[in-house]
Structures are given as structure tokens and as C-alpha cells.
Amino acid sequence: MSNCNVDLQSIITGLSKLKKKALKKQTEMLKPFGLTSRHAGYIMALSDGRGMTMKALSETLCVDPANTTRVIAYLDEMGYVANDCQKDGCRKFNVFLTDKGKEIAAQMKKSVACDSVEIMDPLTEDEKRTFVYLLFKMAMDNYEE
């Protein structure tokens, strides 16, 4: 084992607190639409308009395919997504945001921008850029498939 002065538990705890704070804000914003933070990642992943397969969504969001199936079924029921399946029993199809889903995505983007400012307010501009850079560097170097 290498000589390491970094307390991994402190990093995990700090990131967990940030995540909890961000998810709480997200849930508050989505509540009037019958949605929670659980649905947010899917809406944002689909917000570029290209559509994605269920498998691609699961891989993009690093979630279990069964969770993707449940969330997309709910979003479909609520009218936020649709798919391009042309026949019953399609095994592979693309999921897209409906106009209603696109409206939510636009509101989420505005809300996320405001909440990001609030969460990162204690940091200087240089610290913000460094923080985001380091998070992505750690996430990408340690990504497991």
C-alpha cells in the first residue's frame, strides 16, 4: 500500500453532502411536475434531441437497465418521453423527449445553472474551474465498466 495522506472517507462524505444538496434542490424544482431527482438525469440525457436506446441511457447514466426501464415507463406515462417503436414488442427503439419533456429540460437547465452558482458560491472562479476539472479527471481515470 502506498503512503497516502488523503482521507478517502472525507472525500466521499464531502461529495455525498454536495450530491444531497443538489438532489434536494432538483427535487424541489421538479415536484410540481410529478417528478423527482431520480428522473432528472434521464431528462437531461435526452435533452439534446437525438434520442437514445434504453441500453445507451443506462450506460450514459451508469445505472441498472431495470431502473432505466422503470423510469422511462413512468416518464412515458406522464407524457415527457415517447419512442420510435413502430410495432408491438419492439426490442430496440430510441426514446425522445416530447414537447412537454423539452419544456421541463429547459427549466431544469436554468435551475441547474442557478443552483450551481449557489452551491459553488464560496469558491473563487479559479477554484470552481479547478474543482470541476479535478472531479472529471478522477471520474474518468477511475471509471469502471
What positions do the PLM features span?
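C-terminal regulatory/oligomerization modules of transcriptional regulators
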Residues: M1-C4, E125-E145
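N-terminal leader segment of winged-helix/HTH proteins
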Residues: M1-F33, Y80, L97
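A structural preference for long, well-packed, hydrophobic secondary-structure segments
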Residues: N5, K25, Y42, T69-Y74, ...
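Alpha-helical structural signal
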Residues: L8, I12, K19, H39-A40, ...
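Short, locally clustered residues in the helix-turn-helix/winged-helix DNA-binding domain
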Residues: S16, M44-D48, K109, F136
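N-terminal helix-turn-helix DNA-binding core of bacterial DNA-binding proteins
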Residues: K20, K24-N67
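Charged, amphipathic alpha-helical coiled-coil/dimerization segments
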Residues: L23, A73-F136
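Amphipathic alpha-helical linker/stalk segments
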Residues: Q26-M29, T60, I119, A139-E145
